[in-house]
Amino acid sequence: MAASDIAGRVEEMARPLAERKGLELVEVQYVTEGGRRYLRVFLDKPGGINLDDCEAVSRELDRALDDVDFIPHSYVLEVSSPGLERPLKRAEDYVRFKGRLVQINTYAPLNGRKKFSGRLMGSGEEGVTILLGEHELATIPWDQISKARLAVEF
């Protein structure tokens, strides 16, 4: 079973579990690092999550995963916050974080570049609009966004 398939199945299991606890499932990753496999589940909620939130989801998800036992290898389950540089995955994320500093990478160059950093000004059918510098707006089409995340403001 491919890593993306495993992550997808775990996401289907974890999303309702997180929502019952008032949490948002941000992302699920199944990766191999240094010869070990990790199943990473990232959660959030307004105001941020705490250790008790992570522990509760980890405990329930671990039991559920043991019951269905579809992951063919041993792995380490990690449940945590997405951190300050949280990924932006869904259209709702762009609405929620309007006004924040973001970093967006594209699949192909747009106006000669593939990396954009700026203030998230909005989103719509055509894509995401960010303010680059003081006066330059850039609209990045949805289908060109390969990776987007919040950026830390100092």
UniProtKB/Swiss-Prot annotation:
Keywords: Cytoplasm, Ribosome biogenesis. Its main location: cytoplasm. It is found in: Cytoplasm. GO terms for cellular component: cytosol. Belongs to the RimP family. Required for maturation of 30S ribosomal subunits. This is Ribosome maturation factor RimP. It comes from Desulforudis audaxviator (strain MP104C).
